[in-house]
Every structure is written in structure tokens, then in C-alpha cells.
């Protein structure tokens, strides 16, 4: 069963920020047309339905192309994906390779490797999906992925606040999204009841009634990443064509939005609508998922 769509009216808003990270600038006015967005990220159960109906094989389940990785040992080109692995203690936060490992056999069915499964995670957002996997699901569903502008417009929920829920990170001490609780990357206190992804819909909706726009998993958009916003005319801010057909291009990075359960104030203060991060199209990880959008039905 596909996720319920929430109709958004479209309009103009101030996109970006100059308060946190340089790639979020400049602040600029963007206009998006009316569209509909899925209320929550695509879940494991929904992605399983897609795979069952189509026989689709994700990027993480396919051997790596030796031509794209010259000099890499053939034994290291087996199917797999990136898995977050907590460190034993405090580390230099400038080197992400200390807490990310390439794990053979990791994929959406086995997000942490061959010995893991999703038997008790049907309602969690699907992870270990690369960009073409998200595009394929969206096409099957008769939908598409959002542009970065559409995603940020939806996440803001009709406000100009710093966070999707207001200007305070923890209003009244309340945790508003599934983000890292403890000291990154070695101790997660599990204060929210989960260490890792949480079932969708466990936190308050934003002003548009959308769930999990912030935290839990980063979400793919169709917008290629540049180290600052590219200012496009308002008429082109929505519905950018998806250039990808059936294969990922590791030389192209897409823009991720929303932050994830691995975001912490001291490392990745990106659990905000304006925040953005690059990710190569061919990479699947334990903290990236997606949701779809749809255009209004004409008639």
C-alpha cells in the first residue's frame, strides 16, 4: 500500500540559511507549484511490495563495476553497502571513515550485513537504497522524487522557523525528531527508545501534517548538489527532470535533506529544513531513505 499523499498549495518561500553551514547559503526566494507529498518516508514493507511486484534488484545487491573502481581488488567489488559502526570512544570528527564501514552483503533486506534482517522493522523507513533505487520505486508508484526546493518547502510546514517545529531545538525539553542522543559517534543513550531508525510517525507532524521530515533518515532529492545554492528563476524551481535512467553515476552527487538519526549538535547539526548534504548516486547507507511526491491530477 502506497503512502497517503498530502496536497500542498504551492507558493513562494525563503529557502536556505546563513546561520549554520556555508552550503546552505544564500537565502533566496523560491516559488514552487502545487504538488502532493507522501506523509511519511517509504517503509520497508512498502519497498518489499515494490520488489515483490517487479523483481527489482537494488544497487547494493549488484556487484560493483570494476571499470568504475580501477585498482580495487576484485574481492572488494562484491555486493554490499555502507554501515554505521560506533567507535570505541571519542575520535577526530573530521574523518568519517572511522565510523563508516563497507559491509559485504548489506542491502535493504539486510541493512547491517548478511546476519541482519528487517523482520521487526516493517514500519521503519527503508534504508540501503541508492538514488536509482528510489527513482525506480517512485516510477513504479506513479510518482516521483522531490526537488530540493519542494522538499524544503514541505519540511518548513508553512513557517520560516529554524526547525520544522519552531525556533527552539527542544521546546520544553521535548525531543521532536529521531536524532543522535549522547556523544557522537561512540555513545547513543537511546533516550528516544531506539538506537538507529525508528518506526515512521513517532514524532509530531509539522504544519502541513507531514511526518519524519526531520531526523530518522536523510531523504534523496532530484537536485544535484553544489557547494552553495544555485539561484534559478522561480519558474524552474519545481519539477526538475530526472536525468538518471537505470544506472547510477558515481561522479554525480544528489542533494540529501532532513538529517538522520546520526545527526548530533557537535557533528551534524543538520536536522533542519535548510540543511543539505551531498551523496553520490551509487551509495547506499544505513541512514538514507526517501519519500515520493506527485503532481496535481489535471482535468
Curated annotation (Swiss-Prot):
Required cofactor names: Cu cation
Ligand binding (Cu cation): 263, 268
Entry superkingdom: Bacteria
This protein's pathway: Protein modification; sulfatase oxidation
Result after altering residue 260 to A: Strongly reduced formylglycine-generating enzyme activity
Top-rank EC class of the record's enzyme: oxidoreductase
Catalyzed chemical reaction(s): L-cysteinyl-[sulfatase] + 2 a thiol + O2 = an organic disulfide + 3-oxo-L-alanyl-[sulfatase] + hydrogen sulfide + H2O + H(+)
Keyword DNA repair: no
Knocked-out gene: effects: Cells are viable and do not display growth defects. They however show reduced sulfatase activity.
UniProt keyword list: Copper, Metal-binding, Oxidoreductase
Alphabetical list of Pfam families matching this protein: FGE-sulfatase
GO molecular function, one term: formylglycine-generating oxidase activity
Cofactor note: The catalytic copper is required to activate oxygen and catalyze oxidative C-H activation.
Function per UniProt: Oxidase that catalyzes the conversion of cysteine to 3-oxoalanine on target proteins. 3-oxoalanine modification, which is also named formylglycine (fGly), occurs in the maturation of arylsulfatases and some alkaline phosphatases that use the hydrated form of 3-oxoalanine as a catalytic nucleophile.
Protein name per UniProt: Formylglycine-generating enzyme
Organism: Mycobacterium tuberculosis (strain ATCC 25618 / H37Rv)
